[in-house]
Amino acid sequence: GEWITNPNGTLTMNPFLEYMVENSDKRHQINTTVYGLVSIPWIKGLTYRLNYNYTLDAKNLYNYSRYEASQQGEASKQHDNSSVWLLDNIVNYTNSFGKHAINATFVYGASRQAYDNTLAKGQQYTSTVTGYNDLGQAIIQTIRSSAYKESNLYQMLRTSYNYDSKYLLTATLRRDGFSGFAENHKFGLFPSVGLGWVLSREAFLSEAEFMDNLKLRASFGVTGNQTSRYSSLAKVELNAGSKYVFGDGASTSIGSTVMRMSNKDLKWETTAEYNVGIDFSFFKERLTGSIDFYRATTKNLLWDVIIPTMTGFSSVRSNVGKLQNTGLEIVLGGTPVKTKDFQWNVRLNFSTNKNKVVSLLGQDTDGDGKEDDLVASGLFIGESLGTIYDYEVEGIWQLADKENGTIMKGFYPGTYKIKDQNGDGEITAGEDRVILGHKEPAYMMGISNDFSYKGFELRFFINTIQGGKNGYRSKIAKPDYIGKSIGNAENLSWLTAYDYWSPRNPNAKFATAWLSPTVDTNRMQNRSFVRLQDVSLSYNFDQRWTKKLGVSNLRLFISGQNLLTFTGWDGWDPEAGIGFTTDSYPVMRTYAFGIDLTF
């Protein structure tokens, strides 16, 4: 006989066959928590606490389908076991002497995470009776297993001092160790110190009755970022393509291949941050807020540095350079109107952050007096981590360009016209790519409003992310019919299918869907947006009325999320950078209506 094909000529499996399988999914979890607290009687304020937690997850997944593996059956058994344990020893001392208050905490702890997996699989069965309980009768048999473990060891000493609730001091010293780093660099030392001054408690401000609270803060601290497990070690794999013969006349054996380079100098990425801030509350908390300014310098960034292909590897995990982040965060809250029956509360948050690469490898191989960029890794001195370095699109090649011979070699009418930056008549990666902008936004802001009138309450929240002139940019996917069969729309950008180039649509926004030039790229778009994210309207019934019904509280509400989005982004979601593709989804617009009852 002949296979029954789909209308478009493909042999895609009938989705209902997925229900004609024998599955078993058994999961077991064990959680153990041990907690102990001891107060030392002969030293006032001294305590010891023990925290221990252990979690074990075990999964047994069995599957059998007689229609898989070319209609001859496929079965598998998979066993997964993962465990995590955490142990903390905590010594704490707290005491006060008149206007002085002190606190000291010492922590010694450790944690470990482990995972083990085994999969046995069989394909093409002579009998369908035993299914996954007799994998040995399968013609094609596969066995795979994997395992990993990682551990942390840490100590921390924190002390704090408080004088008359006006002058505050906190100092911390933390030592962290992680198994994923190189042998001689597993531990990092991270100090921090913070100062606080509550001005509103000072005598010289005692007559400022409008002031509820005014506090100045300043801090400095160092934090660490750990790498992934085993990333400092070389990765070696058995490879059927790397066979060898040991001795004359011997049979071939499967050899091993080094798939990733080791780095014996891999160590902690560290960030030193300065922060100054102010907290305030005025007019009996009718106006509240906080303002923070920070500058953070990160050294020894953990980065997969691109290396020459002649080494046999594409990249190596390394510590590189220095990165600086500077930012401002503002939170404001207020009650502009407050009467007996009506109240309006508003809250605004604003944040902006700019980062730039200060240094990289410290090399000047071209002798121009400037430190070299790591172009292959996308790192540029003086630019942000999210720098977009690509070809610049300045239009679309037209039929007239081909007719008059001005079209570049390797391009066709309907393909993107890439700007020839050096004017040599060719488009090359080394000479014609430029910095087009940055992925990071210029600022983020949100504002919430809460209006209440008697039993009614209206709330809404507006969220916005703005990119400024060249920020918060991403590529928007173009149509992708190339190499696809009729009716197959994998990775197709639906939006661009409505405005792609054709002889009848020469002024289209996007390139043709049918041709691929020698050098290709996509247009960049700004993802800035303003979104009405949450809205709710509710009514609380008077308790004098609800009590007659035997109900202490009765509330009706209606709400909606993601109701409106204003943006120039051609795609489903500007915040996630998702275009109109078949493997992505829009932000869901949801509505809800409900009743809250309390008896």
Q: PLM features: what roles do these ranges have?
A:
Residues 244-259, 294-320, 347, 354-440, ...:
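Surface-exposed, extracytoplasmic segments of Gram-negative outer-membrane nutrient-acquisition systems
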Residues 1-64, 74-388, 454, 519-599:
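Extracellular/periplasmic, surface-exposed regions of secreted and cell-surface proteins
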Residues 69-72:
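Flexible, solvent-exposed loop segments that connect beta-strands
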Residues 451:
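Short, structured surface segments that line ligand/substrate-binding pockets
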